[in-house]
Amino acid sequence: MANPHQIYRHDAAWDRQVFRSLATSLILHGHIKTTLDRAKRLRSVVEKIITKAKKNDLAARRQILSFLYAQKTKAGIKVMPYLFNKVAPRYQERNGGYTRIVRIPSRLGDNSKMAIIELV
């Protein structure tokens, strides 16, 4: 039987790139629509990032910067200041559970299970 926890058959670099992109988008936009399996894996990535951001020290900033894409959105919002000034203070009193996964109907093309992952 195949390993049920091994979701993707790609190499580690591909996984890292996809989850860097998804995590950056989730932090900037507050919610994204993706497949259910990706949402479940993304949850642990984002929870660790927000927990590190709550510390708000130089080491935490460098660790997060090494993972997230330091990009601007079309509205001109940068990821790092937004994470440390808006997102992390919102969860200062919360001990985990920063994200919510909501299942939505399957995708029409290939019937993949879809979900919306959002920051609580």
Swiss-Prot record:
Top-level taxon of the source organism: Bacteria
Keywords from the named record: Ribonucleoprotein, Ribosomal protein
Pfam family, any one: Ribosomal_L17
Entry GO MF terms: structural constituent of ribosome
GO CC, one annotated term: cytosolic large ribosomal subunit
Quaternary assembly: Part of the 50S ribosomal subunit. Contacts protein L32.
Similarity comment: family membership: Belongs to the bacterial ribosomal protein bL17 family.
Protein name according to UniProt: Large ribosomal subunit protein bL17
Lineage: Bacteria, Bacillati, Mycoplasmatota, Mycoplasmoidales, Metamycoplasmataceae
Encoding gene per record: rplQ
